[in-house]
Swiss-Prot record:
Zn(2+) binds at C310, C312, C315, H354. Keywords: Glycosyltransferase, Metal-binding, Queuosine biosynthesis, Transferase, tRNA processing, Zinc. Pathway: tRNA modification; tRNA-queuosine biosynthesis. Homodimer. Within each dimer, one monomer is responsible for RNA recognition and catalysis, while the other monomer binds to the replacement base PreQ1. This is Queuine tRNA-ribosyltransferase. It comes from Acidovorax sp. (strain JS42).
Length: 390
């Protein structure tokens, strides 16, 4: 089940404010979706995700199929019961992970033959198998199996002919995914994925074919796969706003805070990316005034929080805690620097909470700006503040 309502639009861009109703709850859009690859957003309790405003999270079809396996998932009634998350979940199709295996896989019209990265077993993923796995996971949004068109093929930029071959296979797999999804009687929502590499004419062909299939929602895939930023932005400016206005639009695997705000301006409703969690574990933190490298020696004695304007547990602490010097109960940059240098577990937990809070709060501010008819002003202010530097 999926219902999508447009609540407001921006007159200076393609941005829109929406409300997405799914089987496990309502999602206010535009939204960022934290990535929970193995059934967990790394280092963060489900309760903390809810507290920071997460409305929908991702699960990884491929990895959950590998471990713990479908028998375990079925015994819990799906992914929600397994990971104790009562809000909506989106699962990818497994196509990107299979594509990432490189020489360990062979793609044919029927599907993908590959060796399990866990134990080396020979396995097969097809559109039908992907739909069966995602039906067992009982995710609210299911993604068609597609072939992620790479930016480079055999050491050269993917040619238009190579991108066409890949896009047309994804289009045929979309038909098979939809047929199997309907045969299984899956009560959730299936999204089609626009492919075509960096070629706008192929993107348009893919888009038109998928729209004819009448999916409940659509995604733009095959971006942020190694291409230069200007080419990614070019596709982002071309494709999303051409998708049906009355259906949700999802930009897969993107990206930086700047990418999210520009994506919203191009008509995107949904985003996911591992960047906030991965960067947190590697010591890069996002703030209102730019990115901060907590490993830099200059933070060794810094008493400031990561971001004085942030209300996450890392920056503001827990309610009711303060210090005699008037400071808040949050953690200093010096303390987070110390945890990182010592390899303490608490370090990446706190930085992950901060980065996710930043992303989710950014989308909340975007929604509020759209509600107020002020998205253009917000967009300009956001750019200026991020460019200022920490």
């Amino acid at each position: 089940m999926l219902k999508f309502e447009i609540l407001a639009t921006d007159t200076s861009s393609h941005a829109r404010r929406g409300k997405l109703t799914l089987n496990h709850g309502v999602v206010q859009t535009p939204i960022f979706m934290p990535v929970g690859t193995y059934g967990t957003v790394k280092g963060v309790m489900p309760r903390s995700l809810r507290e920071m405003g997460a409305q929908i999270i991702l699960g990884n079809t491929f990895h959950l199929w590998m471990r713990p396996g479908l028998d375990v998932m079925q015994s819990f009634g799906g992914l929600h019961g397994f990971e104790q998350w009562d809000k909506p979940i989106l699962t990818d199709s497994g196509g990107f992970q299979v594509w990432s295996l490189g020489s360990m896989r062979k793609i044919t019209e029927e599907g993908v033959h590959f060796a399990s990265p866990v134990n080396g077993d020979k396995l097969f993923m097809s559109p039908e198998v992907s739909m069966q796995i995602q039906t067992t996971l009982n995710s609210d949004i299911v993604m068609q199996l597609d072939e992620c068109t790479p930016y480079e093929t055999n050491g050269h930029k993917t040619t238009e002919a190579e991108a066409r071959k890949s896009m047309e296979m994804s289009r045929r797999w979309a038909v098979r995914s939809k047929n199997e999804f309907e045969r299984l009687g899956n009560p959730n929502a299936l999204f089609g994925i626009v492919q075509g590499g960096m070629y706008k004419n192929l993107r348009q062909e893919s888009l038109e074919a998928l729209v004819e299939m009448d999916f409940p929602g659509y995604a733009v895939g095959g971006v942020s796969v190694g291409e230069p930023k200007d080419e990614m932005l070019d596709i982002m400016a071309h494709t999303p706003h051409r998708l049906p206005a009355h259906k949700p639009r999802y930009l897969m695997g993107v990206g930086t805070p700047e990418d999210l705000v520009e994506g919203v301006a191009q008509g995107v409703d949904m985003f996911d990316c591992v960047m906030p969690t991965r960067n947190a574990r590697n010591g890069t933190l996002f703030t209102r005034y730019g990115d901060l490298k907590i490993r830099n020696a200059r933070h060794k004695t810094d008493h400031q929080p990561l971001d004085p304007s942030c209300t996450c547990h890392a920056c503001a602490g827990t309610e009711g805690v303060s210090w005699n010097d008037g400071g808040r109960g949050g953690f200093s940059r010096a303390y987070l620097h110390h945890l990182d240098r010592c390899g303490e577990m608490l370090g990446p937990m706190l930085t992950t909470i901060h980065n996710l809070h930043y992303y989710l709060n950014l989308m909340r501010e975007v929604r509020e700006a759209l509600d107020a008819g002020q998205f253009g002003a917000f967009r300009a202010r956001f750019k200026a503040e991020r460019a200022r530097g920490v």
